[in-house]
């Protein structure tokens, strides 16, 4: 005789929808668990008698019920819906911008991150490419579904994807750092000090900690949260009615400012936030909520960025044009991209990097000399780079094994109530501090070797960096 008990966990904050299934067959208990909509992981344990098997199964069920799980019917909850940003991109009538190089990723691209070493692009097919500043491909990953955005948090680079996972790209295998509930139609993500902010189609905004546990969630009267930005001051949420700021600790609303059009993109600098809107403007606000300069464009704004401290403000519209303004709101120039409308953009060292509806990562020279030459009709010869053949990336749960930790740091997995936690066992670290570590590769009593362990910015937990291997006995 077989007995099946099926449970689900559905946190109100919408960040954890998981299942737990216990199947008892004679003397065997099989436990399967994971995210709703996925196959999950399974464990099987044999017992000396059917009675002992039933008692073990009942104990496991009680543990889950006490931690928030509830009885449910399998299959009633649907997999996540996905909203992909759509721009009906028109050709620009402005002069061509001075493009230095453009990389054809192969599919519409939403994710971009630029630093002194690398230029990263993530596209609709889940392909991520890292280029140097001359446009040469240095690295690539292939993720299961489309990339919504690329987000940096200190030295960590993350990819938020349509499958609801946020992947850490610091090692050679992308690892799942956060798993967002299937009923959340994700619009945008941001991360600061290991805390993930999520905004969605329904106007909700939530903050999730480094253990993938909800800190708080706010249901608003708005919708279409295309902007969420994390800062020391709070979480800034841009939506159908403007921009709202929430307190980091408990999600208390600090201020709200209305915009005439819906917010379609957001940016922040040290003391300001910027919202590109459907009414062809960029609204700026101080981080204390005071309205500041409004930047007027000719079409709906789907991306924006600034030079250091807002000295210049850049914008991209749905007519394949980019704009530049000074701090006072004066338009300095408007030029065509030549490669579609910008879904996202970043500025660095007199260059604007855009990712577009045509799937390009384009590097545009916005120095005064280059812009003046472009306005006069003189353009550089743009280097055109095609994407290399896509290389398969191992699944996020793939683990190499080693019997020698070498210079790595050893971690151990242990049970803490209903949760599996991690601690550092290598001498010299605080063994009582928790560790941010992928949930879907944790196995009780297992040991792992990681390239590096670094303290979080606030010093209250550790974060892994680089490659992860399973430590085994020789």
Pin down the residues of each PLM region:
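A short beta-strand motif characteristic of beta-propeller blades
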Residues: 97-104, 136-141, 173-180, 213-219, ...
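Blade-level signature of beta-propeller repeat domains, shared across WD40, Kelch, NHL, RCC1
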Residues: 339-389
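Structural detector for short beta-strands of small beta-barrel domains
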Residues: 396-420
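Beta-strand/loop nucleic-acid-binding surfaces
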Residues: 426-444
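OB-fold/S1-family single-stranded nucleic acid-binding modules
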Residues: 456-474
């Amino acid at each position: 005789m077989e007995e099946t008990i099926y449970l689900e966990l559905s946190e109100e904050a919408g960040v954890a929808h998981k299942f737990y299934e216990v199947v008892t067959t004679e003397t065997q208990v099989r436990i399967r668990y994971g995210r709703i909509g996925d196959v999950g992981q399974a464990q099987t344990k044999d017992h000396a008698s059917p009675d002992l098997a039933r008692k073990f199964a009942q104990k496991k069920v009680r543990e889950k019920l006490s931690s928030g799980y509830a009885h449910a019917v399998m299959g009633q909850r649907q997999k996540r819906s996905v909203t992909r940003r759509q721009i009906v991109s028109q050709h620009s009538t402005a002069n061509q911008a001075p493009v230095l190089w453009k990389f054809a990723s192969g599919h519409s691209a939403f994710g971009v991150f630029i630093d002194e070493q690398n230029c990263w692009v993530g596209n609709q097919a889940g392909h991520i490419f890292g280029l140097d500043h001359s446009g040469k491909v240095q690295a690539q990953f292939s993720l299961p579904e489309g990339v919504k955005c690329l987000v940096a948090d200190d030295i960590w680079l993350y990819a938020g994807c349509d499958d609801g996972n946020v992947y850490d790209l610091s090692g050679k295998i992308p690892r799942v750092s956060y798993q967002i509930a299937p009923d959340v139609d994700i619009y945008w993500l941001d991360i600061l000090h290991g805390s993930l902010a999520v905004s969605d189609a329904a106007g909700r905004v939530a903050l999730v900690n480094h253990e993938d546990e909800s800190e708080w969630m706010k249901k608003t009267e708005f919708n279409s949260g295309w902007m969420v930005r994390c800062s020391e001051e709070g979480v800034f949420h841009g939506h159908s009615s403007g921009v709202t700021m929430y307190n980091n600790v408990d999600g208390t609303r600090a201020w709200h400012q209305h915009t005439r059009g819906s917010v379609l993109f957001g940016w922040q600098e040290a003391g300001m936030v910027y919202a590109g809107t459907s009414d062809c403007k960029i609204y700026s606000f101080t981080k204390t909520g005071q309205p500041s300069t409004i930047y007027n464009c000719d079409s709906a704004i789907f991306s924006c960025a600034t030079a250091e401290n807002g000295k210049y403000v850049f914008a991209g519209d749905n007519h394949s044009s980019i704009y530049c303004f000074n701090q006072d709101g004066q338009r300095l120039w408007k030029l065509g991209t030549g490669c579609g409308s910008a879904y996202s953009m970043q500025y660095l060292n007199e260059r604007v990097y855009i990712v577009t509806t045509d799937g390009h990562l384009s590097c545009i020279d916005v120095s005064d000399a280059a812009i003046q030459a472009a306005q006069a009709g003189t353009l550089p010869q743009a280097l055109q780079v095609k994407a290399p053949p896509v290389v398969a990336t191992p699944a996020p749960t793939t683990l190499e094994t080693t019997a020698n930790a070498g210079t790595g740091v050893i971690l151990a997995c242990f049970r803490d109530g209903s949760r599996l936690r991690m601690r550092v066992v290598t001498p010299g670290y605080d063994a009582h501090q928790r560790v941010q570590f992928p949930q879907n590769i944790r196995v009780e009593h297992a040991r792992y070797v990681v390239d590096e362990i670094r303290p979080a910015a606030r010093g209250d937990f550790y974060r892994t960096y680089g490659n992860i291997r399973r430590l085994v006995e020789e």
